[in-house]
Amino acid sequence: MGHFRFIFEDFRPEIRQYFIEADQDALPFSRMQRSLVYQRAKNQNADKPFGSIIDVYADNYRFMTHSLSPCTPADPKTFRILVGNSQCSQPYSASIFNISAMSFGSLSANAIRALNKGAQMGSFYHDTGEGSLSPYHLEYGGDIVWELGSGYFGCRTLDGQFDPEKFAVQAKRPQVKMIEIKLSQGAKPGHGGILPKDKISEEIAEIRGVSRDHDCVSPSSHSAFKTPIQMMHFIQKLRELSEGKPVGFKLCIGQPWQFMSIVKAMLHTQIIPDFIVVDGSEGGT
């Protein structure tokens, strides 16, 4: 009978989700939130009549109050920010809401297609993640931000170094709007990413430029630069190779003095990144 414990452990997530979990238990998203996504994905009406199951009298419940003289709704076309300083010749008008980094390989081809189709429909950008730029990112024509991690997937030599010629070919694509250098990530403090070899298909190996014989590991730091000043020159190099597209970097701030050293390098070299992405320590960008 003791062996049934292992069966129950296997079924535990499903039992909890279908029989125990309340509609508003958010771990990380509640059933109510997930249902809203499902219905909108199917273009179905997500409104429910006869009140709400939410306790609107609970502490810290936030709501919008009515006005007898409401403002005219803003034009969605104004919800954009121009990214690109004077050192960039192809600035990009970015939406204030976008799709942050998720790699092909970790996500399926259909998931990448769906995300990029959404970006195309909503006129916002889709960050590739460090797993390279795949054909599925390009299929529907949504704007792309190409994330470049320490593994240089999609633009690397056989020994894992940065290959400027391969980078230029991809970066010059009209659909690629910006380049993002990943320095660090909240979900992976102190080390690079890993894709187990069992998940590396022939297609993934070809897209990333890696072998299928072992796990695909991103180094903990970049080989193309070692110091903040070298990083600024690398940013300028990527700008030139991409024909003037915006180049920025992503980091999860650990020690404030390390970030200040990057700021000092900007002042010293007068090379200014076009944007900075701050990654949350809980893993959220």
Language-model features, listed with the residues they occupy:
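Alpha/beta enzyme core
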Residues: 117, 133, 138-140, 159-285
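Conserved, well-structured core domains of diverse proteins
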Residues: 1-97, 101-120, 124-125, 132-141, ...
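Glycine-/small-residue-rich beta-strand-loop submotif within the FAD-binding core of flavoenzymes
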Residues: 146-154, 203-209
